[in-house]
């Protein structure tokens, strides 16, 4: 996969602007990251099951643009960071009652969608392999020279409209 406009539009925040990564086939994503990334359901419930707790949302930056709401986030279970992401949410494709919940920033989008019962599908568009020495945010534990893995994902509503486009990056897990 190449850097399309959809992906390039997500690499706008300072942490991702110069992100070095390569696209890899899902079968080449290391375990346990393959189990966490290579599926067609939401990350919130996947991370909650894997880490054994409620996933909490921390927003680093957010802004509303004419056609969407963009936010840079960290998901945590307790104090442990479990995912860093940048998400472009197309609010006009959501029912009005969900828009205010999304913009309130109290819950991850996956939790809001699952609690609402709104029909949607997760469609990963590719998997990222990121050299740990080039992406070292202070909120992730050191990678120990290993690679980090992530994915480019789209959430598609039951009406086939794009609900969100997301870059999701996972920290290294301790062996």
Regions found by a protein language model. Give the residues of each.
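Composition-driven recognition of glycine/serine/threonine/acidic- and proline-rich low-complexity segments
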Residues: 1-175
